[in-house]
Amino acid sequence: MRSKIVVKVLPHVMRSTNEFNIPPGDAHGYEILYFGVNLILMFDYRLSFDIEVKSSDYGDEIDVLIISRRDVSVWKNKNSDDGSRPENIKMHYSNNGQKINDVFKPPVSDAYAFILSNRSRRDNKKEFKTKTVDLILTHSWQQEIKESQLKNRL
C-alpha cells in the first residue's frame, strides 16, 4: 500500500519599509540591500519596489541597480564619473528617476544586491547632494509544503 503525500502551495510575502539618507559621491553615495533567491524552492518569486526621492528639489533622481552579489566589489571600486559601467558586471535591472514603481523577476537562483546609487555622472551637470529616499520592498513567492510538515508545526 502506497502512502499518499499531500502537497500544498503556500504564498509568502515579506515587506519592508525604509528611509535612507544617501550622501553624494563615488566613495559612499549608495545603499545596498542583499537578498537571495532559490527558484527551486521559491517559485514565482517577485521583488516589487516602490521608491520615491523625498528631496526638496524637483528632478532629483536616484539610480536603482540589481546585480549579482559577487559583482558588488567590482561595482564599488568602479569610478563612475565617466558614465560607463564595468563590462564584466551583468546588470539584472537598471533604472533611474524620482519615483520608481517596478517589479523584478530574477532569471536565475542567485544572491542579489539591490543598490540605490547617488554617485555622480559626467553627463549630469547638477550639483549632487544627500538625498532622502523612501523605499518599500515586497518579496513574494510561492512554496510547496508537504502537509505532514504543516501538522508538525502546529
What do these predicted regions represent?
Residues 1-154:
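Acidic, Ser/Thr/Pro
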